[in-house]
């Protein structure tokens, strides 16, 4: 785990301001608490504007893009998922289904409490000499738990995702495990022991779209991530996502996005809109 200010992060990064137009994809969690100015950041191809007191939570596998990091001050917290205790990970919703919206906007009564928790974590991280290493490490675990659970509490107020029908929650997790293996709703229904009608009804209630549309959206998102971040040809991405051919993948992608895979990739290598 690492905790630092955005200014420190910029100082440590030799090629700052980086290639701002280049999307990044990490295999760890990144929390950003904006403390001054306004930060603009893109996560999974959606732009977010963060005023002071707001948080951004970027999760492993998500593609993100800096836009104006020099115009804001922020506290950054980076951690691997295995640094979090299993109980906290479960309560905070780590690693379950599609990542929730990354923007968190605490109300005036919650914002200072969250900020204080983050500041305590930052202080402990920077003062490792004050305690024996086992105590220091234990404190980092506990203080990170506080931040994550408070943020998860905000998410639950705003989204109430876990109150969705159980068939949808199981389908959501099955899609995360298997979207590159099968694109057939019948296969998920058989695996989970539901009818396709039950899955579609539950997904409509929870997500506002059919089970097939939900699966297609997840495939499109992963395709966008691979196209934006990497350099693999469309044929390789097609195979990774379980399509029988690059042609089939190209038609699927264009039907859902209005662009060919290569046109989409090219659009992500230029400066995104503010």
List where the protein language model places each region.
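Short acidic-glycine-tyrosine-enriched beta hairpin
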Residues: 45-59
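Amphipathic alpha-helical segments enriched in hydrophobic/aromatic residues interleaved with Lys/Arg
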Residues: 94-155, 173
């Amino acid at each position: 785990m690492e905790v630092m200010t955005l200014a420190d992060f910029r100082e440590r990064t030799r090629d700052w301001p980086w290639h701002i137009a280049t999307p990044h994809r990490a295999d760890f969690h990144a929390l950003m608490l904006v403390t001054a100015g306004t930060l603009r950041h893109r996560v999974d191809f959606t732009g977010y504007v963060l005023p002071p007191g707001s948080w951004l939570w970027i999760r492993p596998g998500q593609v993100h893009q800096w836009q104006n990091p020099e115009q804001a001050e922020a506290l950054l917290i980076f951690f691997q998922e295995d640094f979090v205790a299993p109980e906290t990970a479960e309560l905070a919703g780590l690693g379950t289904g599609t990542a929730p919206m990354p923007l968190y906007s605490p109300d005036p009564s919650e914002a200072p409490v969250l900020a204080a928790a983050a500041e305590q974590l930052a202080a402990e991280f920077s003062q490792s000499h004050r305690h024996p290493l086992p105590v220091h490490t234990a404190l980092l675990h506990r203080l990170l738990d506080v931040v994550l659970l408070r943020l998860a509490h905000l998410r639950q107020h705003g989204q109430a995702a876990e109150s969705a029908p159980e068939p949808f929650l199981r389908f959501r997790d099955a899609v995360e495990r298997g979207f590159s293996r099968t694109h057939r709703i019948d296969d998920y229904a058989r695996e989970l022991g539901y009818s396709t009608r039950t899955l579609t009804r539950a997904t409509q209630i929870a997500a506002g779209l059919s089970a097939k549309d939900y699966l297609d959206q997840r495939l499109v998102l992963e395709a966008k991530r691979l196209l934006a971040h990497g350099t693999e040809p469309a044929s390789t991405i097609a195979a990774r996502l379980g399509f029988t051919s690059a042609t089939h993948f190209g038609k699927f992608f264009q039907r859902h996005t209005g662009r060919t895979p290569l046109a989409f990739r090219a659009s992500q290598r230029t400066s995104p809109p503010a």
